[in-house]
């Protein structure tokens, strides 16, 4: 294999690696956006659960004992 062929082979491999790296980066960016969105949803659900939990606690305090 001549030097020119070796250089062409290396350039070809580098181009494929660049494409792979870009594809992986695109997936990583998409996953990061999805993770950020899921974290916001989780925070909203936790807040809602806390609000609903305090509503149920007041109902339980006002309820008569089970033997009535």
From Swiss-Prot:
Gene3D superfamilies: 1.20.5.300. InterPro entries: SlyX (IPR007236). Disulfide bonds: none annotated. Belongs to the SlyX family. This is Protein SlyX homolog. The lineage of its organism: Bacteria, Pseudomonadati, Pseudomonadota, Gammaproteobacteria, Pseudomonadales.
């Amino acid at each position: 294999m001549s030097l020119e062929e070796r250089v062409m082979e290396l350039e070809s491999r580098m181009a494929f690696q660049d494409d792979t790296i870009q594809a992986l980066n695109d997936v990583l960016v998409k996953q990061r956006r999805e993770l950020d969105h899921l974290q916001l949803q989780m925070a909203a659900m936790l807040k809602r659960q806390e609000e609903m939990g305090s509503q149920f606690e007041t109902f339980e305090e006002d309820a008569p004992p089970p033997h009535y």
